[in-house]
Amino acid sequence: MATLYIVRHGQASFLAENYDLLSPMGEAQSRLLGQYWSSRRLRFDRVCAGPRVRHKDTVKLVHAAYEAAGLDLPEVQTVPEFDEYPAEAVMKFGLPILLDLDTRVRDLHAAFLHSAEPKERQATFQRLFEIVIAKWAHGGLHLEGVETWPEFCSRVNAGLDQFLSAGGTAAIFTSGGPTAVALQRALDLSAQRTLEASWMVRNSSWSEFLYSAK
């Protein structure tokens, strides 16, 4: 049996102008992950990352921790199939549609705009985000030119098929969505459970799978 580690990136810059950058906390989380793995002498045959800055910067900080410990990490491949689902596009184009149709969305959006306390603002946005993304995932939002949920899952699974075919101990640095698709693949989760899992995966955590290479 071979082993796969799927890592969610360190904390990104939530509600900042550029979400894709690691926050100072995200950088610290990534360093700690690298220090922990290197302290356990965990070695990989292959490592890849999704295409986002937050994916690549997380693995760079893990790599730096390995170098500091005198250990090697394989050259990192960038695999576009392990990008996150198109959350930004869904929110940009889907939210205005739901603001016209759903009272609950309008109320949450108003509460978000008027909330001054950071934790309250973050919690309100998360509830709003989950409603809009769930509507899209279940086919309730048809957004021209935006990847659908089934297309997203197919993309990630195609990446997994290709990356896992070589076997060995492998690591993928990605986001919560692709991690959840791997969980769906292993546990036969429903679409709703898969979506919920994508929101539960913690920053810089890893999910570990045993698999048979094809």
Where in this protein do the model-derived segments appear?
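Active-site metal-binding loops of divalent metal-dependent hydrolases
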Residues: G10, G176-G177
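Short aromatic-enriched loop/helix-cap "lid" or pocket-rim segments at secondary-structure transitions
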Residues: N18-Y19, A87-F93, Q184-R185
